[in-house]
Amino acid sequence: MSEYLVTGGTGFIASYIIKSLLELGHTVRTTVRNPRDEEKVGFLWEFQGAKQRLKILQADLTVEGSFDEAVNGVDGVFHTASPVLVPQDHNIQETLVDPIIKGTTNVMSSCAKSKATLKRIVLTSSCSSIRYRFDATEASPLNESHWSDPEYCKRFNLWYGYAKTLGEREAWRIAEEKGLDLVVVNPSFVVGPLLGPKPTSTLLMILAIAKGLAGEYPNFTVGFVHIDDVVAAHVLAMEEPKASGRIICSSSVAHWSEIIELMRNKYPNYPFENKCSNKEGDNSPHSMDTRKIHELGFGSFKSLPEMFDDCIISFQKKGLL
């Protein structure tokens, strides 16, 4: 069995990866800003094997050298820590762009210091570093060779895509410069059951839309993917020797209006949003090419109804709906 580091342990993707790795028998380290905040980290200790094989360490994405201790001696690093959705009235540079870009640089730099023992790094990037292009529709199906255009992101204020694109580019630069084995997973919009005590950014958006509290639903045409598939893709990226480069992890592409209709038909008692945002730039019809992940042995992706059912049912079980 191996010892792995998963950054940002309380995050949606990270917590599921930790749970899966522990169930597989691995030893896991994870980093959070405050390991003593039981309200946020307590649920991690409930995972099977956590008390015997989980360590929670302190680290900060924006502090250089912060990950040195956590990385030292592990076999592999899953760098998943990243803000996703930040309220528009916040300082985007400070709360979104810097943590993504500086965080990636800091984690990769810590990995370079331990490269004698470190076998592989798996970085969680995003389809947002692929699909934000002026020619997204014409170039579809988009594959691992496509990159988002930072100028497109700036024009339409797509700051998450902007930061993820620059952050991933920086990761590849450092990996090449330092001779690190890097594999990148590019998931689309991740959906599935809530694992932690409170919904995090993407699930919080779905909950607000289901409760009619968002004011409008996003004018997004985006790929969606079940959290179980994202976790499986990360483990495959780490443990499959043939895995390399970027790996798109995405099920169906749909506009949010289709998702609203899907959920409203299944759950007619909830006041789903009726109004679509008029924000432009994130609504280009496109498709994603997932041949690469299937060639590595990945099975079939879960469907839109499965992922949203699992999400809504988890909200119901936790008394949020």
Swiss-Prot record:
Catalytic EC class: oxidoreductase
Modified-residue entries (N-acetylserine), positions: S2
Gene Ontology biological process terms, A to Z: pollen exine formation; sporopollenin biosynthetic process
Regions annotated as coiled coil: none
Subcellular location: Cytoplasm
Record flagged with keyword Acetylation: yes
Enzyme Commission numbers on file: 1.1.1.-
One Pfam family matching this protein: Epimerase
A single cellular component GO annotation: cytosol
Disruption phenotype: No visible phenotype under normal growth conditions.
Amino acids binding NADP(+): 4-28, 40, 160
Keywords: Acetylation, Cytoplasm, NADP, Oxidoreductase
CDD domains, sorted: FR_SDR_e
Metal-binding as UniProt keyword: no
GO MF entries: oxidoreductase activity
Family listed: Belongs to the NAD(P)-dependent epimerase/dehydratase family. Dihydroflavonol-4-reductase subfamily.
Function in brief: May be involved in the biosynthesis of hydroxylated tetraketide compounds that serve as sporopollenin precursors (the main constituents of exine). Acts on tetraketide alpha-pyrones and reduces the carbonyl function on the tetraketide alkyl chain to a secondary alcohol function.
Name of the molecule in the record: Tetraketide alpha-pyrone reductase 2
Organism: Arabidopsis thaliana (Mouse-ear cress)
Lineage of source species: Eukaryota, Viridiplantae, Streptophyta, Embryophyta, Tracheophyta
